[in-house]
């Protein structure tokens, strides 16, 4: 196993939905993440199930199955504090929580994967390595 495959990949909701349902970038994303450990905050759980419900109630099971394959970070005081104070103020609240969780990881984080332009810019501003395989 290569060094990069042992490093964690933080994924946000825009990436997660591409793992659940076929979208333009789904195949490239799956290949990019193959065998790599995935992690995200508990916010992803809420966002993913809500996205599944918008598609179809039967899609909730697909999202939940994928969520079980990932490590999940709970939101604690330091994450809330960092997210609350995150600059610039235009960073959306849920994005700020994702970014704070990624920054506070005590594991070897390789990258954050997102397909959302605002999230990408905010992550870069936070000093994170960002990718959007396509």
What are the residue ranges of the model-derived segments?
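Short coil/turn segments
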Residues: 21, 44, 88-91
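His/Asp/Glu-enriched, well-ordered alpha-helical/loop segment
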Residues: 48
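Surface-exposed charge patches
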Residues: 65, 100, 121
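Acidic active-site catalytic centers that drive phospho-/nucleotidyl reactions
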Residues: 12, 95, 116
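Short, well-structured N-terminal submotif of metal-dependent ribonuclease cores
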Residues: 1-40, 52-64, 128
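Acidic catalytic patch
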Residues: 68-89, 95-101
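Alpha-helix capping/helix-boundary segments
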Residues: 15-16, 44, 79, 98, ...
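Acidic, PIN/NYN-like endoribonuclease modules and their adjacent C-terminal/linker elements
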Residues: 1-8, 41, 73, 104-134
């Amino acid at each position: 196993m290569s060094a990069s495959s042992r490093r964690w990949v933080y994924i946000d909701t825009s990436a997660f939905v591409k793992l659940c349902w076929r979208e333009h970038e789904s195949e490239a994303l799956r290949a990019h993440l193959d065998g790599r450990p995935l992690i995200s905050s508990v916010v992803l759980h809420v966002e993913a199930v809500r996205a599944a419900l918008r598609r179809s109630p039967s899609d909730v099971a697909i999202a939940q199955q994928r969520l079980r394959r990932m490590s999940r970070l709970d939101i604690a005081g330091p994450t809330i504090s960092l997210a609350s104070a995150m600059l610039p103020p235009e960073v959306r609240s849920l994005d700020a929580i994702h970014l704070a969780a990624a920054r506070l990881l005590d594991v070897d984080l390789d990258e954050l994967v997102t397909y959302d332009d605002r999230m990408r810019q905010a992550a870069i501003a936070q000093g994170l390595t960002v990718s959007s395989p396509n």
